[in-house]
Amino acid sequence: MAQADIALIGLAVMGQNLILNMNDHGFVVCAFNRTVSKVDDFLAKEAKGTKVIGAKSLKDMVSKLKKPRRVILLVKAGQAVDDFIEKLVPLLDTGDIIIDGGNSEYRDTTRRCQDLKAKGILFVGSGVSGGEEGARYGPSLMPGGNKEAWPHIKTIFQAIAAKVGTGEPCCDWVGDEGAGHFVKMVHNGIEYGDMQLICEAYHLMKDVLGMRHEEMAQAFEDWNKTELDSFLIEITANILKFQDTDGKELLPKIRDSAGQKGTGKWTAISALEYGMPVTLIGEAVFARCLSSLKEERVQASRKLKGPKMVQLEGSKQAFLEDVRKALYASKIISYAQGFMLLRQAATEFGWTLNYGGIALMWRGGCIIRSVFLGKIKDAFERNPELQNLLLDDFFKSAVDDCQDSWRRVISTGVQAGIPMPCFTTALSFYDGYRHEMLPANLIQAQRDYFGAHTYELLSKPGEFIHTNWTGHGGSVSSSSYNA
């Protein structure tokens, strides 16, 4: 008998928690897992006493669903998603809906959308952020794909999503085809950037200011009452305070080799592909790569010398405030770059993205949730066509206010030999973006000199000129070499 509102395939912790969240909101969910014993275990333990029902096979699961049938896949990205889709299609009817809630690559989502549309099935690729806790009590949801599916899943999605402000759900329709998963990918890239910026602030506190763990924890707690109020700042304070069973701080005992699952790398690759200078996320990915060279760094630390110890000028408290402002300014740059990539992707794929809506989706329930995102939403509400966050009056004045501190921190850190890849690239981007003239004219001349690639004159844009530079710039002649 058809009694379930929706089915979910994949009973790892995220899947189980999403089912329990839907159950809490009055929806009847049918649970299925490839290992059927997991379904029985779930119904006997975590889902005991709920309205959740189980299925012994995909056919059994489909028979228990109300029409149009809605099926969420929460399985490993890649081949597993395609395998389940292949098995589901013969069991479904025209107008039924398959939702991929995993971390799928956005191009895969676009391909699946197109393939399934031809078969009459509505496909949705939805970013799900917030981890296990978010899945259970309110994630950030970023659905995209075949928009015909949205009226049939909107009630469920917005009911279970995190709420902010006056109860606004952190979920809305993102856009066509792979838009939802693209937005989730950029979210994850920004997460990499936020985490690395916090690490650089921590490094400066520890090695320039010589702060103890409890002092650093207090600083992050204080910062969490400012514009930096966010989940990542909050947990950083908790991590710094956390003591091991021996009563000593746990953090210094953790091996300094950061792992990654690849979503930050995807963002950096997309930025290169679409010609967007998303430098901060790129540097955050490379910082993790460098951290993973632990054995090499141990050897290098014994052979490569850094600068002599630099005496900090001014008070420690003043420098700590400078670090806070440098972190805030760099964070603004990171989000500005992330939204530049979203805008470029929208142009590439013909998506209509609601940038303020995306900021709201990230405002709660996800790892990068912060008060700051409300300011981004406001900026796009003031001007939906805003080209860059830095051109919004609020963010322009915020960076103006932080600029002197930002430059002091980077100067001091460089002199002290502290690696700050994200602080420094953020400032370099800001300085590059605000320069009317950059030295790229020399690059164009060099390219024309050795490769006859032509250049434009400032006075004649759109007209491409080649110069025979021999005799004016040296004895090298032009060739067809590409660079």
UniProtKB/Swiss-Prot annotation:
NADP(+) binds at residues 10-15, 33-35, 75-77, 103, 478-481. Pathway: Carbohydrate degradation; pentose phosphate pathway; D-ribulose 5-phosphate from D-glucose 6-phosphate (oxidative stage): step 3/3. The active site is at K184 (proton acceptor), E191 (proton donor). Substrate binds at N103, S129, G130, G131, H187, N188, Y192, K261, R288, R447, H453. PROSITE patterns: 6PGD. Belongs to the 6-phosphogluconate dehydrogenase family. This is 6-phosphogluconate dehydrogenase, decarboxylating. The lineage of its organism: Eukaryota, Metazoa, Chordata, Craniata, Vertebrata.
